[in-house]
Amino acid sequence: MITIDGGTGVILNNGVEISSEKMVDEWRVHTSKEHGSGVVAVTEYWERNDNNFALIGKSMTESSGVFSFPITGIFLIRAQINFYTNGGARAYLGCIIEGTSDNSTYVDIGGNYASSSGTNYYNGVSAQCVFDVTDTSTHKVRLKTNFPGTATVQGSSNYQRTAIHFTRIGNT
């Protein structure tokens, strides 16, 4: 028997939940910033997308580049970084999604690399992962870059040059 809980709106089939709460949120970096070499967290200039986007469900929170989840569940996380290289070729340009399940130790949970063959090049790198959030107080994510030399992480308040997108795809 299919029922809908009057208090929560949860759809049940013989007492088993068959529909999970929906959530989609998207954030971007609004101002470009040059980053030094090595692995560097993207900690500044984050804002929620406000161009042709509508938040679905609950919203993520961000503090110094660390994103906290409002509810438990399984999340698809997609990230992209647009780099501008202005000092020669780069052997690698990395977009890394890091996660923690203890609010302390971060590990790579998604990542991808590209390279730049010259000066004054724009390069887009994207990464994605699935993250099982079982505790909203301890599970968090952040976006990091990795490259030799310097490069500028491109920002924009009009569209998503450097951005992170969260979609809740199911219950944990």
Show where each model-derived region lies:
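Self-maturation zones of extracellular/virion spikes and adhesins
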Residues: 6-8, 35, 92, 121-122
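Short, surface-exposed beta-strand/strand-loop-strand elements in extracellular ectodomains
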Residues: 89-101
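Short, surface-exposed tryptophan/glycine-enriched loops
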Residues: 118-140
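A short, structured loop/turn motif at beta-sheet edges
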Residues: 70-72, 99-104, 132-140
